[in-house]
Amino acid sequence: MARIHTRIAHQRKDFLHKESKKIANSYDIVCIENLNMKEMSQDMHLGKSVHDNSWGMFTDFLTYKMERAGKKLIRIDRWYPSSKTCSCCGKVKEDLQLSDRIYECVCGNRMDRDENAAINICREGIRISGMMLDIEKKIS
C-alpha cells in the first residue's frame, strides 16, 4: 500500500512540475489567488478533497519557475471577491453561494462562476502591477 501511495505522490509531483513549467514558459505575468487550502478545508467542511489537492506545492513550483525565468507572479489576496464581482459591470453579489456554479448579474452577464472569477483575478493583477493594457482584448 505504501508503494502505491509513493507512486501516486511521484506522479502528482511530476504533473505539477510539468504544468507549472508550461505556464512559466507561456506567460510573462501570472495572477493567482493566495488561497489557504488548510483553512478552507476546515472552515468550509470540504475536508480531504480540498486539503489533498496540492495547491501549495503547485504554487511553490510556479513561484520558483517564474522567478528563474525573470517573470512575474502576482498573488491576489484571498479575500478579494473574485467570484462575487461581476466581470462586466463590477457589481458585487453578496448572496453568491458555493453551490451557485453559474454567475448571473442584474446587468445580464451570465457565465461560469470560475470563468468570471478568473477574469476578475486577471484584472486585479493588472491593477496591482500598474500595467496599462487593453484588458478586454487580453482577457477575451
Where would I find each of the regions flagged by the language model?
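Positively charged, helix-rich recognition surfaces that bind polyanionic ligands
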Residues: 1-140
